[in-house]
Amino acid sequence: MRWSVDRDREFTEFVMARRAALVRVAALLVPGDLARAEDVVQTALTRLYVAWPRVRPDTVDAYARRCVVNAATDHHRSLFSRREQVRAKLPDVAAIEPRHGDAASIVTLLATLPASMRAAVVLRYVEGLSVAETAHAMRCSEGNVKSQSARGLERLRAAFPAHMRTVG
């Protein structure tokens, strides 16, 4: 299949419109620093570009989120395969558009959750996805999303009770 100029333009428009939102999600999925989140998004966008001719227009957002979740999972796995561990730094809090005064504390607490639990919480409560959409993005069952979300919120509430009463 021949790649068309229209497809390149469509992909560029999609990236311009959605990149910032994808970086916000990645910054919460891969706590450490904003540069790592941007690397995850770049990897995800590269995968999306390759698949672009096959992606239906009505599913492109879901496909992009799945690419980000998969790239974040790959990043997380690669940390354990390395001999040296880099010290984590907090992401640029302004880049994730906090809704609470204690956004740095929330980001720090999210970093303490296991990767799959963090992904479920971020996709459900930061991105506002449904259980089905989150399950699709994480490639797991809806029941797994529900339990991971509930356990994640439980851990966050225990560590940060004053600000978590309105979530969930």
State each model region's role:
Residues 69, 138-162:
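DNA-recognition helix of helix-turn-helix
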Residues 14-34, 50-51, 110:
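Amphipathic, Lys/Arg- and hydrophobic-enriched alpha-helical face
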Residues 120-124:
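A short pre-motif secondary-structure segment
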Residues 2, 6-9, 81-111:
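Acidic, proline/glycine-rich intrinsically disordered inter-domain spacer in sigma factors
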Residues 59, 66-88, 99:
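Arg/Lys-rich amphipathic alpha helix in sigma70-family domain 2
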Residues 4, 32, 43-60, 78-80:
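Sigma70-family region 2
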Residues 22, 26, 37-48, 67, ...:
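Short, small-hydrophobic-rich alpha-helical interface motif
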Residues 3, 111, 115, 127-144:
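Helix-turn-helix DNA-binding module
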